[in-house]
Amino acid sequence: MSDKIMLLDGHSLLNRAFYGLPDLTNAEGKHTNAVLGFLNIMLRYVEEEKPTHLLVAFDRKEPTFRHIKYKEYKGTRKPMPAELHEQVPLMKEVLKTMEIPIITQAGIEADDILGTIGKEAEEAGFDVAIVSGDRDLLQLATKKVKVKIPKTKASGTVTEDYYEDDVRELYGVSPTEFIDMKGLMGDASDNIPGVPGIGEKTAAKIIKEYHSIENAHDHIEEIKPARAKNNLQEYYEQAIMSKDLATIKKDCDLSYDFKDAKIGTLFTKEAYQLFKELELKSLFKYFDEEEKEEETLEVVTTSDLGEVENLFSSIKKSGQAGLGVIGVSGNCKGISLTWKEGTVLALIGGFVTEDYLKEKIVELLKEGTELIVLDYKALLHFVEKVREYESQIQDVGIQAYLLNPLQSAYDYEDIARDYLRQMLPSRKEICGKKAIEEVFEAEEEKTVQMAAYLSYVPFHAYPLVFEKLKEQEMEELYLTIERPTVATLYEMEKYGITVEKDALKEYGDQLIGRIEELEQNIYEKAGKTFNINSPKQLGVILFEDLKMPFAKKTKMGYSTNADILEKLAPDYPIVSEILEYRQLTKLKSTYADGLAAFIQEDGKIHSIFHQKVTATGRLSSSDPNLQNIPIRMPLGRAIRKVFVPDPGYVFVSADYSQIELRVLAHMAGDEHLIDAYRHGEDIHRMTASQVFGVPFEEVTPLLRRSAKAVNFGIVYGISAFGLSQDLKISRKEASEYINKYFATYPGIKTYLDGNVAFAKKEGYVKTLYGRIRPIPELSSSNFMQRSFGERVAMNSSIQGTAADIIKIAMVRVSKRLQEENLESRLILQIHDELLIETKENERKEVRKILEEEMMGAAQLKVPLSIDIEEGKTWYEAK
């Protein structure tokens, strides 16, 4: 079996990888998506081709001989995006640690290096595989030289392999004749002119018959069509020059040795260290354990009562410890503790019971010990009494979230990576989909390490994280808003909300009835039955059978997304019914069917509230997601009827009125808007009067609704295009509305522009309470990304401040309910609404608390206002 060499086109593959993967950065902000994509492609082909030799060629900055021949060569190419440019030296560094030779040479391109080495390797008896995203390299294909072209398709990256015969089959010409084809058709990406009016098909036809540009010119009178003949005659010299530019050199004077390209380890210790630094975790699987040289954390495990007592005694003296719970209450395996002496797992066994460990945790707090955890809420679910000592509990997960709210997770491995520079195996890698308590005994060695990380990481990261929090001036935000919110969310999770099963079933039946009715209506109007849920079948019905406009065909068929259907709905009743059908089937699967799965033995749903998910600071929920319960359509709102209070209670709901607009008025300092709120004016009606040029008393409900869209659209940085879509008006009209709006409220325009300018300079915006929202999109080389970043800069301070205020209100309301020994409790927070399950004889007190605490949650230049409703279901209370 002969040796095989694989030659990679460095810049071409790096470019393809950059655009094929979403932006990725490590903790230091280094972009890594192109590096990761390049390595994925390379390692995949190493596995498939099994080469014995490997090298990579890169272009250089200096002009090449082609630029000298034709100064406009590649003259139309845009500069490389900064995010890609910075990864070129990084990629070379990675290849160096993997002991893969890199070849570059001034005056020539990587293509010429690949052509030269490919030819010499073939002559030396190698099988050759050349990998590039550039089809120009097809001219290098022979019977022993294969050109591999990775292509991105809907199913992922696929590879087209070309030997000499494959090129001939595809184009009807040989690889050498392919150069003549390029000479005729030109190459827009390289700014090679070719012959005007001759495209790929005509070029292939001419060269297939005449084999070269020169021979075709010798038979110029035979060339068809006439336009191609005339143009070839006129631009013959340009065609020859283009052919010359397109020809890859195979005789460059290069300094290299094949033995240097022989594949060795690839996955060296140096490579592993660099992969760790770049956080290329998905590639760690390629390394042997000896290359990883991971330090195993020294952990002591014990179930001996005497040893555990000594452990707690030692921690009391130290005054500070990291704490993690191994498992959940009722199925706990023990606790993990780290302090200055080391890490110990106190495991349940003998006299060391779950209750004993809970008592000892509380005892530590009573003695003044500071406990550092990854998740304070999880600790509350294990031992509720710790909330009495909240000032001694530090939640490193929340602190890390405040410092970088754009991450997807803040578990021990994330914090260890970002602050301790350690790459630790994640819970998922160790436990799969199972909980730690399920696998603890079966794989004790692995899970002991993981359990140790639960206390080791927060303990050692805390000083670094908290210091950074102080540097960013978010200590107060953490201490007065975020940490107190944890216990409030815990209470909401613990209480839950009752769902009436019979009402839920009735709701589901109601949906089924309407869905079936819609199905029949749609089939009648379509003239046939089909799968309404199939975009492909639906597209054929709408755009081929019914000949509707706005047809937009993709590789997968006609697009039937909501934007297109909403354009058609006013004129086509079948489309309105399809949109309603989609909404109702989603309601059925998500709520009518979905909610039933979450009802627990107590008849309640105990949704999980998340504090570390959104970039703006807003809360979210899951299992189930109660934040997304629809309110715009009647059947969507009706789902609230299934949520009921316990016997003897009613629901009291309090909803902030226009909180984001009030925050905007305060932060922008716009006197016109501030004055309107202070005098209790109808803001939307006032805006309609000013923007649409209508006397205040003549503003219709429709105009008021349009003004409302403008008001809230401005808060979210809406564009003229976006507003035109919302109001179904021309972009010009929308632009005029926005301009009139800013003329009416000039302070808002100044404020929003100031936010964008600040964000471009600093890379973030801040809320009134100091919460930071990073906006990396503003430094992107992509125009769409930058535009998105500008919209984020406009609205994040407003959204984030509103989120901060609702958290302050939640904490204050919950605290007052407890301080006044009321049996009523806060059970839900949805956007700007608080829902209180209220004892019937406590309605008056609860209303008073809501008014005082919600309206007093922030001291703004405009008053905060709330709307209070009550009822025997959530629907009635809204």
Predicted regions located by residue number:
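Extended two-metal-dependent nuclease catalytic cores across DNA- and RNA-processing enzymes
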Residues: 2, 22-26, 75-251
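Conserved RNase H-like, two-metal-ion catalytic cores of nucleic-acid enzymes
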Residues: 5-6, 10, 16-55, 71-72, ...
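Active-site-proximal helix-loop-helix substrate-binding element of RNase H-like nuclease domains
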Residues: 154-182, 299, 336-470, 481, ...
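Conserved "right-hand" nucleotidyltransferase catalytic core of DNA-directed polymerases
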Residues: 231, 235-351, 371-374, 434-631, ...
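Function-dense linear segments that define catalytic or interfacial modules
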Residues: 336-341, 403-434, 450-457, 611-695
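Conserved catalytic core of nucleic-acid polymerases
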Residues: 438, 494, 606-607, 611-614, ...
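Active-site palm subdomain of RNA-directed nucleic acid polymerases
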Residues: 469-481, 485, 805, 809-830, ...
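C-terminal polymerase-core module
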Residues: 513-520, 524-576, 743-791, 795, ...
